[in-house]
Amino acid sequence: MTESVFAVVVTHRRPDELAKSLDVLTAQTRLPDHLIVVDNDGCGDSPVRELVAGQPIATTYLGSRRNLGGAGGFALGMLHALAQGADWVWLADDDGHAQDARVLATLLACAEKYSLAEVSPMVCNIDDPTRLAFPLRRGLVWRRRASELRTEAGQELLPGIASLFNGALFRASTLAAIGVPDLRLFIRGDEVEMHRRLIRSGLPFGTCLDAAYLHPCGSDEFKPILCGRMHAQYPDDPGKRFFTYRNRGYV
């Protein structure tokens, strides 16, 4: 019997970007069995409700009267998916999307081949997919291009490293073991805290190097210090800066 995949997308006041994300999601060669959209601005006649209802697959619209942030939104969507009997939960936000129609099928195949509890695609710059949306540090070296993640010919998996939650695919049993995102973190750092839970669990996970999720570039937040020998994250937006440092201190 084919295992069920529930897609969970969290959105907040970006209906145009959400529409693009859902267009790619519903064009996958392996379609999700159900789509759950958590609307963090779900008061009154939200345009998102109509957008979700018009999708070509089974859907659930969850409108929240309170902005739960990415953390609370994903937690709500994940729990709803689990309650509906999902075997897999595939995550996305409203400002990014899968690179092509084969991403979900590729992630499922990678998880099956390597017996993974969670698998993520590479997260690449939506304006230049050859570059990573967020730099990845390996030792003292920052990797900024997707090609730099492969260290040998034919490599398919980067074990023990995953970007959450952009395109991340979780087994239901994994979420039962490590839990869902912490509502208190709201945004910024919720994915880091959950990544640490995933590491502590000892469950196998990694990044599939044959799949990509496109996301706006976040590299500009990493500012060079000590004449470029190191970098520090410093978001320009004061709200993002607050949650970045508050949550980093907590984690």
Feature locations, PLM:
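Short, well-formed alpha-helical segments that are part of the catalytic scaffolds
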Residues: 14-27
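A conserved acidic beta->alpha catalytic loop
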Residues: 39-49, 96-97
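Glycine-rich, basic loop-to-helix element that forms the pyrophosphate-binding segment
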Residues: 64-84
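Short beta-strand-to-loop acidic/aromatic patch adjacent to the donor-nucleotide binding site
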Residues: 86-95
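Conserved donor NDP-sugar-binding/catalytic core segment of glycosyltransferases
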Residues: 101-134
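A recurrent flexible, glycine/aromatic-enriched loop bordering the glycosyltransferase active site
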Residues: 150-170
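A short, conserved alpha-helix in the catalytic core of glycosyltransferases
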Residues: 168, 174-179, 184-212
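Active-site-adjacent helix/loop segment of glycosyltransferases
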Residues: 204-251
